[in-house]
């Protein structure tokens, strides 16, 4: 039987509807959460993201402000601006917009954001709360992915859960959140021997490696230095035959890669003569959906939940500040 496709949009919509009412209730008391996104310079790559952030905030009634600093802002200047926002009572949430210019350490600045205004859950104090299974606020993608699993009402306690990827903002916190739910957790990564043997025993599988995009970007860099660089393997990291039949598969990765490449690594072109780019996960979705019991699509799976958790963090931290 084909897998049930997990509709992240639908689950996220339920969260947003609840938040919309909570914001309405706060406003009735004269209290409005305000989210400030701090951006250094103007990044074309983040324009769409910022626009979507603002739209999402407005849909549930949050105030949203883009605080755009000059391109030549240094780390000290950015830290000072964050400290000012920490002190501003009208600001209840702060986002640090990526990418940051060279010379500015994102970790350093994120550690300056007040834990109660850190709606991305990246302050070390908030990351530490994940250890206690109390991510409020917690890293949005990790929390969103686990909330998506919980929405399925499938057994978690005692199940073998495997997390592919150990990044600080996704893989590690997912593992900790699963441990808090009493799953038996294995975390695997680029240095793990025999990845397939771990994946095969997973009742619950989270995949957050971003392998295909990493391979493609590395190829592009190396090709500039050496045109004879061999074409990369940008096929999905997780193949259908690696899965345990009936596994629940949560694909967290977002890979923006060519639809196909030739033997020299040249991408297929679209009708406009430009590289045909697709968005895919780390799992071979079409084949895996015939093996798994539940599976997330990419896009449309974890992505909407990331946005929903960002807004949930914003509302929840505001409620604490208003209390």
Which sequence ranges carry the predicted segments?
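Short beta-strand segments enriched in small/hydrophobic residues
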Residues: 33-41
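Positively charged, low-complexity intrinsically disordered leader regions
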Residues: 1-31
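Phosphate/diphosphate ligand-binding glycine-rich loop within oxidoreductases
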Residues: 61-63, 67-138, 290
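Glycine-rich phosphate/diphosphate-binding loop of Rossmann-like nucleotide-binding domains
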Residues: 40-54, 136-216, 228-253, 257-267, ...
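Charged/polar low-complexity intrinsically disordered segments
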Residues: 218-225
């Amino acid at each position: 039987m084909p897998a049930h496709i997990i509709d992240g949009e639908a689950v996220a919509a339920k969260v947003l509807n609840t938040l919309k009412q909570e914001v309405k209730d706060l406003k009735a008391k004269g209290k409005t959460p305000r989210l400030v996104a701090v951006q250094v310079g103007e990044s074309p790559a983040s324009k769409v993201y910022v626009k979507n952030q603002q739209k999402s905030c407005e849909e549930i009634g949050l105030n949203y402000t883009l605080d755009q600093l000059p391109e030549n802002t240094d780390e000290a200047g950015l830290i000072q601006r964050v400290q000012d926002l920490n002190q501003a009572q009208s600001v209840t949430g702060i986002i640090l917009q990526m990418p940051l210019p060279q010379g500015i350490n994102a970790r350093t600045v994120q550690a300056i954001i007040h834990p109660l205004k850190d709606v991305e859950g990246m302050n070390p104090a908030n990351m530490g709360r994940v250890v206690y299974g109390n991510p409020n606020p917690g890293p949005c993608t990790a929390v969103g992915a686990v909330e998506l699993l919980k929405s399925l009402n499938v057994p978690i306690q005692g199940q073998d859960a495997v997390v592919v990827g150990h990044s600080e903002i996704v893989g590690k916190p997912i593992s900790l959140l699963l441990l808090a739910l009493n799953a038996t957790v294995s975390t695997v990564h680029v240095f793990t021997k025999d990845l397939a043997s771990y994946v095969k025993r997973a009742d619950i599988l989270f995949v957050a490696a971003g392998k295909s995009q990493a391979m493609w970007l590395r190829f592009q860099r190396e090709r500039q230095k050496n045109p004879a660089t061999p074409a990369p393997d940008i096929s999905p990291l997780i193949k259908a035959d690696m899965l345990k039949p009936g596994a629940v598969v949560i694909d967290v990765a977002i890979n923006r890669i060519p639809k196909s490449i030739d033997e020299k690594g040249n991408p297929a072109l679209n009708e406009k003569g430009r590289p045909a780019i697709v968005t895919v996960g780390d799992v071979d979705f079409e084949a895996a959906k015939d093996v798994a019991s539940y599976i997330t699509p990419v896009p449309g799976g974890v992505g909407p939940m990331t946005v929903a958790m960002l807004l949930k963090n914003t509302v929840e931290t505001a409620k604490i500040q208003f209390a």
